[in-house]
């Protein structure tokens, strides 16, 4: 006779239409336990080439992706419908300029190039998938320089964390964090400084204060009879250096309480906005001309330079019967002096009263005085 437990059986049905009297129930003698193993997660390893050939012509090539299954033995509710994705990426992708052009010319002294060892060409790091997509989709929003300077700074910071010193030849760059006063309080500002330019600030300040302004000798003032202290006007080399000195810009009457935070600069500005705009000149030249390889700090300077290669001349002389066109507004202003007769550049030698419309013509003329003395 069967026990009570063998006779007692329960059947649970939902929305069943068949009466229980027509269902024959059979007891189960043994329940077989089956262990379930399935691949519930995957690891995606993205190996990004961090060498100089990881991009070409400004286009990013998709990295190699290797899939490796991971076996999971513990399943919770709903785990079989989910996948865990881990993206391993090397660094953020930024705009790229032809690396061959980065070594051309002498105007690349301020650029920063990261040396990469052979072991660093394929090296994985770990990042979340959502963070990777945010870096890719929000790149332009995060960069105040249109994705160029900010992206390059990100790469250099990554190299600095790994012990790599960003340098180009003898250039050694160091990042400096400064605090700038804003409307909402102080905020940090990252600035790159060339270690080779570090000198004694006191000596630089004294030298800056003692340097006279010789530009007045190019616009009408005559040389004194005793000459200029420290300059031999009879020496062609010293005279050529004298003519190549840049004139100092006249300072306005408004106060300039904000000083440039870059070591050794010392320039003063009327507000923080003007100072922050000036700070860009101390950074790397990331805007490179694809035609000749010249590099510029600001994209606007690069666009103006590219007019030389394209042959475009948007500036036209408005004087009747002339109509000459120029690629730069500066050249147009200089050309207009031919029509107006304006000759602001006067020979500084006492016995000479020649005047010129362009400073370059005056500089060439000044050297003739030394040549004539040597011929006598």
Curated annotation (Swiss-Prot):
Keywords (A to Z) from UniProt: Activator, DNA-binding, Metal-binding, Nucleus, Repeat, Repressor, Transcription, Transcription regulation, Zinc, Zinc-finger
SUPFAM superfamilies xrefs: beta-beta-alpha zinc fingers
Region feature Mediates transcriptional activation, mapped onto this chain: 36-109
Subcellular compartments: Nucleus
ZnF bounds (C2H2-type): 258-282, 287-309, 315-339, 345-369
Annotated GO MF terms: DNA-binding transcription factor activity, RNA polymerase II-specific; RNA polymerase II cis-regulatory region sequence-specific DNA binding; zinc ion binding
Statement: the UniProt record of this protein carries the keyword DNA-binding: yes
Region (Disordered): 201-220
Further information: The gene encoding this protein appears to have arisen by retrotransposition of the YY1 gene in placental mammals. It is encoded by a single exon found in an intron of the gene Mbtps2.
Protein family according to the UniProt entry: Belongs to the YY transcription factor family.
PANTHER family, per database record: TRANSCRIPTION FACTOR YY2, TRANSCRIPTIONAL REPRESSOR PROTEIN YY
Protein name from the UniProt record: Transcription factor YY2
Natural source organism: Rattus rattus (Black rat)
């Amino acid at each position: 006779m069967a026990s009570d437990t063998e006779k007692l059986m329960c059947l649970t049905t939902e929305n069943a239409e068949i009466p229980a009297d027509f269902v024959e129930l059979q007891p189960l003698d043994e329940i077989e336990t089956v262990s379930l193993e399935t691949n519930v997660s995957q690891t995606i390893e993205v190996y990004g080439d961090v060498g100089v050939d990881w991009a070409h012509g400004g286009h990013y090539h998709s990295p190699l992706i290797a899939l490796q299954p991971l076996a999971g033995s513990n399943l919770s509710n709903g785990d079989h419908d989910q996948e865990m994705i881990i993206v391993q990426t090397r660094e953020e992708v930024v705009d790229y300029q032809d690396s061959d052009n980065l070594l051309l010319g002498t105007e690349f002294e301020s650029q920063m190039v990261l040396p990469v060892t052979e072991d660093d060409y394929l090296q994985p790091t770990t990042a979340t998938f959502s963070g990777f997509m945010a870096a890719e989709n929000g790149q332009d929003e995060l960069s105040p320089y249109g994705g160029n300077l900010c992206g390059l700074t990100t790469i250099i910071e990554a190299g600095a964390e790994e012990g790599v010193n960003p340098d180009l030849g003898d250039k050694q760059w160091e990042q400096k964090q400064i605090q700038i006063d804003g409307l909402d309080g102080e905020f940090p500002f990252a600035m790159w400084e060339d270690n080779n330019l570090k000198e004694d600030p006191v000596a630089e300040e004294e030298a800056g204060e003692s340097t006279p302004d010789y530009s007045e000798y190019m616009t009408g003032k005559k040389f004194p009879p005793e000459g200029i202290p420290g300059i031999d006007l009879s020496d062609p080399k010293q005279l050529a250096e004298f003519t190549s000195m840049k004139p100092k810009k006249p300072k306005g009457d408004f106060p300039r309480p904000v000083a440039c935070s870059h070591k050794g600069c010392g320039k003063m500005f009327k507000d923080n906005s003007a100072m922050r705009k000036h700070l860009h000149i101390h950074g790397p030249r990331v805007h490179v001309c694809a035609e000749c390889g010249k590099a510029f700090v600001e994209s606007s300077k690069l666009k103006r330079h590219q007019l030389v290669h394209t042959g475009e001349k948007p500036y036209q002389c408005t004087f009747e019967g002339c109509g000459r066109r120029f690629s730069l507004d500066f050249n147009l202003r200089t050309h207009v002096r031919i029509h107006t007769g304006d000759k602001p550049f006067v020979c500084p030698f006492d016995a000479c009263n020649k005047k010129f419309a362009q400073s370059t013509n005056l500089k060439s003329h000044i050297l003739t005085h030394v040549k004539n003395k040597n011929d006598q």
